[in-house]
């Protein structure tokens, strides 16, 4: 059995799940990030499944999502990449808050996520060596190129607009896989993707697999590709994530 609560950590609304009676017991912990226009509540089945596996789970609401949503859905659609960047930046204070609660067992902290949340997890892993392992479900580590086709912040039609676009996208380069293959390969990494994904193409995960493989950095890499699956989490994907974290965290 498990327990689950809504609360704030570092002023960030989160879902917090853990095995029953172990709220204050140090445990291996997974920070799991949800997808765009969704919320931690919608993705709470990950919290349930991982807590049932004996892990502590923290699921933050992304900026302008869940209980942080401003109510302006049209504006949010143009803020995907800014939201992603802020989510990655918030990891440092979120991790510190978890440690302050004395919730971590032997610093065993992992990250994972789905869609935008998977991008968040990959970016965090690229910059934070304390992350023990990472699960990316239908994500991408190639932010600056994907920003031209997936929820672009604007369609540049003038030199000024191109400059604005570049200013939004440029900070993402510090977090993306292109510049951090070594950091993404020195601990266990799971890539799961539906091969018929119609939002974040499976080629995004396949590209990362190829980059790691071609440079001999795939020894800790686990890949799971599901034919016929579009942009959604399947029972098989959930099982793959739970199995991965149980094995490596």
UniProtKB/Swiss-Prot annotation:
- Going by the record, the broad EC class of this enzyme is hydrolase
Alphabetical keyword list: Hydrolase
Q: Does the keyword S-adenosyl-L-methionine apply?
A: no
- Domain of life where this protein originates: Bacteria
**Molecular functions (GO terms):** hydrolase activity; protein homodimerization activity; serine-type peptidase activity; short-chain carboxylesterase activity
InterPro entries noted in UniProt: AB_hydrolase_fold, FrsA_esterase, Peptidase_S9_cat
Which EC number(s) does the record attach to this protein?
3.1.-.-
Q: GO biological process: what's one of them?
A: proteolysis
Protein role: Displays esterase activity toward palmitoyl-CoA and pNP-butyrate.
* NCBIfam families recorded: PRK10566.1 (NF007857)
Protein name (database record): Esterase YjfP
Species of the source: Escherichia coli (strain K12)
Lineage, top ranks: Bacteria, Pseudomonadati, Pseudomonadota, Gammaproteobacteria, Enterobacterales
């Amino acid at each position: 059995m498990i327990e689950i609560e809504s609360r704030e950590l570092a002023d960030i609304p989160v879902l917090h799940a853990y095995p029953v009676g172990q709220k204050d017991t140090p445990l291996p912990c997974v920070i799991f990030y949800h997808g765009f226009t969704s919320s931690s509540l919608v993705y709470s089945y990950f919290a349930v499944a991982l807590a049932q596996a004996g892990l502590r789970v923290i699921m933050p609401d992304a900026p302008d999502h869940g209980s942080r949503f401003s109510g302006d859905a049209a504006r949010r659609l143009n803020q995907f990449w800014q939201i992603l960047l802020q989510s990655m930046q918030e990891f440092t204070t979120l991790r510190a808050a978890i440690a302050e609660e004395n919730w971590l067992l032997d610093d065993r902290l992992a990250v994972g996520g789905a869609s935008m949340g998977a991008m968040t997890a990959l970016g965090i892993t690229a910059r934070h060596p304390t992350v023990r392992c990472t699960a990316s479900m239908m994500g991408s580590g190639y932010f600056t190129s994907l920003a031209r086709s997936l929820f672009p912040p604007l369609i540049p039609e003038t030199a000024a607009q191109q400059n604005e676009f570049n200013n939004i996208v440029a900070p993402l380069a510090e977090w993306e896989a292109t510049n951090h293959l070594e950091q993404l390969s020195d601990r266990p990494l799971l890539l799961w993707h539906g091969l018929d994904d119609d939002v974040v193409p499976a080629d995004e995960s396949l590209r990362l697999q190829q980059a790691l493989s071609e440079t001999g950095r795939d020894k800790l890499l686990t890949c799971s590709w599901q034919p016929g699956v579009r942009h959604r989490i399947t029972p098989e994907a959930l099982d793959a994530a739970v199995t991965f974290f149980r094995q490596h965290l």
